[in-house]
Amino acid sequence: MAKIKRALISVSDKTGLVPFCQGLAEHGVSFLSTGGTARLLRESGLDVMDVSEFTGFPEMLDGRVKTLHPKVHGGLLGLRDNASHQQQMGEHGIEPIDMVVVNLYPFEATVAKEGCTLEEAIENIDIGGPSMLRSAAKNYRSVTVVTDPADYARVLESLRAHDGQCDAGLNAQLARKVYARTAAYDAAISNWLSALDNEGRPGAFPETYTVQFKKVQGMRYGENPHQSAAFYAESPPSEEASLATATQLQGKELSFNNIHDANGALELVKEFSKPAAVVVKHANPCGVAVHDGDLLAAYRMARDTDPVSAFGGIIALNRCVDVAVAKEIAQLFVEVIIAPEYDEQALELFATKKNLRLLRVPNIGVATAVSTMDLKRVTGGLLLQDRDLKQLPEGSLKVVTERAPSEAEMRDLLFAWKVVKHVKSNAIVYAKEQRTLGVGAGQMSRVDASRIAVWKAQDTAHTAGLRENPLLGAAMASDAFFPFRDGVDAAAKAGAKAVIQPGGSVRDEEVIAAANEHGMAMVFTGMRHFKH
């Protein structure tokens, strides 16, 4: 370790910069800087030398060339313990630079803005910043390099602990972080530019695609005990409500299957603005309900769709969990609970269940910037597609039967349509009064999915001691078109009175005729929701 005497500071994100540099100044560090960063430091009472004065070469080309100079990169790359390097530096008047604090032009944020032009994107490609970061990181044994404001406190703590020197282990960590950051930065530039056509217009998908994820946690094992696994988050992180942004408040470490299933529950509960509850088992919803103002009622209805399958499941809620809801949930063994918040009494009650995993995801239901790409790994390759985020445009439903749905039926059809989107194909959902009654998931034939959903609803009603048909007057949703009329016949036989489906089959007329024969209302969405 060597004492830090000179730092080069040039940042786009100035968060926490002034107190950090004031802390450096307390250790006798002098500053080199450029442009707006230099102005900020001077306005804060710090002495700063312009890089152009240090190099003896002016900034030029509208600021495109500031730090690309041998006196900068020689000062960063020269090995302090190499006599030849030191001799050459002396001969050319190159002085060592002991610290680099640089973060990059906001390319990712720029291209994320609607209407970003090629010229705007190009001007936000940083050249000097990555060059300095890479030079400093290559010589990390002698140079401390900081690219993330979150590391400022750690660096100052190390300087205080080591008399103005930065710990060698921390230097190595910071260097690794630099190469991860510059790799992600270059990937963002490459992905965006390679998606442009020859006229510079955004295309569909880039010719090459590079992604970066950051490790969140290791795991005991993967989907099965013989598989190794770890959980990674997008880098840079998304602001969207997700498992990657969740805070675990208690319980055992999340397993591979916990995270996979919890993601399905969270994505489904995000569909609803009213108080909603979702119960998921093996990534499929086994119960969903919405209630105008009562989360407890919504949870009870969701659980009671299929209480047998709910045992050991995942629960997602889109409102703060109070003690009344907590008491109801506590009657059932569950693996994970997801909610935006919990009141103190609820937390105290859940604390008695030490293994229960409790997750807080604050921005459930809040419109945020989202990652719009869906990645599916196949052996030897990657399938890349838009995420299935499209909502039904208002007025887009097409009534195709002689009878139109009533207002109540339409509410249930739209509810069931939101649910079926999150069920593995082939998928059928029966619903009534804003709650699921039966879910048929992952079947090779659509009619079998319908039969399973009917059986689940009838079995649950029978177990509960109910005599009436639970599906009488229900709405039925299908994630894809009916290839034959048998699915509609099965729904009518079960008691359903309304159907929502994409349409588009060569036998649509036959299917519509079946619905008319049974006095059912049917609407087409023109949109399919396969899920594999």
Curated annotation (Swiss-Prot):
Report the EC number(s), separated by commas if there are several: 2.1.2.3, 3.5.4.10
**Known Pfam families for this protein?**
AICARFT_IMPCHas, MGS
- Record CDD domains: IMPCH
Named in its record, the pathway it takes part in is:
Purine metabolism; IMP biosynthesis via de novo pathway; 5-formamido-1-(5-phospho-D-ribosyl)imidazole-4-carboxamide from 5-amino-1-(5-phospho-D-ribosyl)imidazole-4-carboxamide (10-formyl THF route): step 1/1; Purine metabolism; IMP biosynthesis via de novo pathway; IMP from 5-formamido-1-(5-phospho-D-ribosyl)imidazole-4-carboxamide: step 1/1
Instruction: List the catalytic activities from the record.
Output: (6R)-10-formyltetrahydrofolate + 5-amino-1-(5-phospho-beta-D-ribosyl)imidazole-4-carboxamide = 5-formamido-1-(5-phospho-D-ribosyl)imidazole-4-carboxamide + (6S)-5,6,7,8-tetrahydrofolate; IMP + H2O = 5-formamido-1-(5-phospho-D-ribosyl)imidazole-4-carboxamide
Enumerate the UniProt keywords alphabetically: Hydrolase, Multifunctional enzyme, Purine biosynthesis, Transferase
| Gene3D superfamilies the UniProt entry points to | 3.40.140.20, Methylglyoxal synthase-like domain
Q: What information about domains appears in the record's comments?
A: The IMP cyclohydrolase activity resides in the N-terminal region.
Family the entry assigns: Belongs to the PurH family.
* Name of this chain's protein: Bifunctional purine biosynthesis protein PurH
Q: Which organism's genome codes for this protein?
A: Magnetococcus marinus (strain ATCC BAA-1437 / JCM 17883 / MC-1)
Name of the encoding gene: purH
